[in-house]
């Protein structure tokens, strides 16, 4: 914001220089027209030039330039947005200047009509035509530059949020934050609204300041009492709208959340359509999604009710502005102290200054929606600022150490926030090239232990030694199918790797998916893979990723649950041939033979670690 302020200071000074040059030039070459529009402007400019004030103007030009030169190394990478911001602010000043000129032209134009003075009428008609020719492209370029700068800002801000969203697995941790709902909407929609609306309000505020400075002088020169009445009227309207607008901010915030919840319900149905169809759960799904919609409708009814009440006030407030200037000026006009054109100019200036003073009144609905969006972005930004904010500070955490093998030493694993202890005092080492199978009843903590190994959970005590996560590959029960080509699916998460098609064909054949490229359009086919492939095909594709990636360690969470025994055996034999060390979670007895050790979680926090031979002989498991 400091650089923006310096830029504004520089532009104000530059605008003064430009106005001075144009005004003094116009007085020399077009004295009659210039003196008719702004007789005292050239005199005022000369007084400033020959006074100490000119030194201040010089400083306003030199100091911002020096600051920008000093910071040029930081600004060069983003020079386009800064150039566009400077152009936009300059155009904003120009538009305000044009409005001032038009107010004077309107004064003389209407006075000439009232006094039946054709010479003055046609002279200012030509002046207005010239201003129109100049103003039209300025206004068009102003609108284009504003939208373009908002787009640049959105691009930068979205990149920043996305970078932090994917750092330290914040996208995973955000699910535990109840106050941060629908992060997708905050990134996709709230940032877009924030950037465009913020820029609009910045320009509105700048225009308001310029209008107050410019038109208050005009208004004061015509009627002091009207100027004072204007200030009182504007303050009254602003106070009333601030009081009434507080409720509107809350309703807008709730509306954003409820609309996002409704949309999420529809997306959830789309993503789980097959499961819903199998369960014949249409009636229940319809009830829940309609409930979300009715919540949005109920809140919107409250919102439009408050908007209606505000509209009563804002309409009355606005309509009164058409009569107030005439009430103040009628007596002095009838007394012959001002011309008819002065009334027209005063009305124009009155509305310009009133709009500047009454931004809260006229923009209360936009401001309330904007405030709600800022609140949502602020909480999300606070969460992303530091990954430690993603979860509450833990009293006890598992100490994770990067080492050459996978080993747990006296690990006690709790659920997040320490609500429940899942495993107590676990010690196990996975020998290189071997496999460990984790078994146990549902809820015993099998998948939770994998989350701890992956660094997703750290609630508890003890010491976890593991390789870098880049040396490990996790295969969940339902593999993640990315949005991309078949090649990208196979190479994920290293989609930029260069692998020839012959090798890709070979790997697919090794997991019994040799026909996949020909059947679905080749390796560059971009399809909805989660919908097209069965769960069994997805699991085999995940094994193909493993064979291509060749990690030192593989963590498999029921990664073959949808496969028949022959395919399961084939894939585990392929895995064993790579000499990859692996940890599996599963329920099938058939998995035991592919591992050297079995870790059984007994469900009460206790556990036992046995060889596969001992586990096979266990009467507890096999009855």
Q: Which residues does each predicted region cover?
A:
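Juxtamembrane loop-to-helix connectors within ABC transporter transmembrane domains
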Residues: 168-212, 271
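ABC-family ATPase nucleotide-binding domain "signature/switch" substructure
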Residues: 489, 523-623
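Transmembrane-helix motif of ABC transporter permease domains
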Residues: 1-10, 47-68, 75-98, 115-155, ...
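A hydrophobic transmembrane-helix motif
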Residues: 90, 134, 138-139, 203-245, ...
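Primarily ABC-family ATPase nucleotide-binding module
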Residues: 38, 42, 179-180, 381-437, ...
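ABC ATPase nucleotide-binding domain helical subdomain, centered on the C-loop/LSGGQ "ABC signature"
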Residues: 471, 487-528, 572-573
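Loop segments that connect adjacent transmembrane helices in multi-pass transporters
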Residues: 251-304
């Amino acid at each position: 914001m400091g650089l923006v302020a310096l830029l504004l200071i520089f532009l104000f000074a530059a605008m003064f220089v430009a106005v001075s040059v144009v005004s003094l030039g116009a007085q020399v070459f077009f004295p009659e027209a210039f003196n008719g529009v702004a007789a005292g402007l050239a005199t005022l400019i000369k007084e400033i030039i020959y006074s100490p004030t000119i030194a201040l103007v010089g400083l306003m030009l030199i100091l911002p330039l020096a600051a920008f030169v000093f910071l040029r190394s930081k600004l060069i990478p983003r020079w386009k947005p800064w150039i566009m911001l400077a152009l936009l602010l300059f155009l904003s000043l120009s538009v305000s200047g044009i409005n001032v000129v038009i107010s004077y032209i309107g004064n003389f134009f209407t006075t000439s009509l009232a006094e039946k003075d054709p010479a003055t009428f046609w002279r200012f008609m030509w002046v207005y035509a010239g201003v129109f020719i100049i103003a039209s492209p300025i206004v068009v370029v102003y609108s284009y530059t504003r939208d373009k700068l908002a787009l640049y800002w959105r691009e930068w801000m979205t990149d920043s949020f996305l970078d932090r969203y994917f750092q330290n697995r914040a996208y995973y941790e955000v699910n535990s934050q109840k106050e941060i709902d629908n992060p997708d909407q905050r990134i996709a929609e709230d940032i877009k609204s924030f950037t465009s609306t913020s820029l609009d309000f910045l320009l509105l505020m700048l225009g308001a300041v310029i209008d107050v400075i410019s038109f208050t002088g005009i208004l004061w020169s015509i009627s002091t009492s009207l100027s004072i009445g204007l200030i009182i009227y504007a303050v009254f309207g602003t106070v009333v709208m601030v009081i009434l607008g507080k409720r509107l901010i809350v309703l807008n915030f709730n509306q954003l959340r409820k609309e996002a919840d409704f949309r999420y319900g529809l997306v959830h149905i789309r993503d789980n359509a097959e499961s819903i169809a199998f369960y014949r759960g249409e009636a229940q799904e319809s009830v829940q999604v309609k409930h979300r919609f009715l919540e949005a409708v109920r809140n919107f009814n409250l919102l439009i009710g408050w908007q209606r009440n505000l509209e009563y006030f804002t309409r009355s407030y606005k309509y009164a502005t058409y009569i107030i200037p005439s009430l103040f000026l009628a007596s002095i006009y009838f007394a012959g102290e001002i011309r008819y054109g002065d009334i027209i100019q005063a009305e124009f200036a009155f509305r310009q200054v009133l709009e500047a003073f009454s931004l809260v009144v006229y923009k209360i609905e936009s401001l309330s929606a904007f405030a709600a969006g800022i609140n949502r972005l602020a909480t999300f930004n606070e969460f992303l600022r530091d990954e430690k904010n993603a979860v509450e500070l833990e009293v006890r955490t598992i100490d994770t150490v990067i080492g050459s093998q996978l080993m747990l030493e006296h690990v006690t694993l709790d659920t997040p926030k320490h609500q429940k202890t899942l495993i107590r005092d676990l010690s196990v080492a996975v020998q290189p090239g071997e496999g460990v199978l984790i078994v146990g009843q549902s809820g015993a903590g099998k998948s939770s232990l994998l989350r701890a190994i992956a660094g997703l959970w750290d609630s508890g005590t003890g010491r976890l030694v593991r390789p870098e996560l880049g040396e490990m590959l996790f295969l969940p029960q339902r593999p993640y199918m990315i949005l991309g080509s078949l090649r990208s699916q196979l190479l994920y998460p290293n989609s930029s790797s260069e692998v020839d098609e012959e090798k890709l064909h070979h790997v697919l054949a090794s997991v019994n998916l040799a026909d996949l490229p020909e059947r679905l359009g080749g390796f560059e086919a971009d399809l909805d893979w989660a919908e097209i492939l069965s769960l069994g095909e997805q699991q085999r594709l995940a094994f193909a990723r493993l064979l291509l990636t060749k990690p030192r360690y593989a963590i498999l969470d029921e990664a073959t649950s949808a496969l028949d025994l022959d395919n399961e055996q084939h894939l585990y034999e392929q895995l064993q041939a790579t000499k990859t060390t692996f940890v599996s979670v599963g329920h099938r007895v058939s998995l035991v033979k592919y591992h050297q050790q079995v870790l059984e979680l007994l469900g009460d926090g206790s556990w036992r670690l046995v060889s596969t031979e001992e586990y096979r002989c266990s009467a507890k498991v096999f009855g």
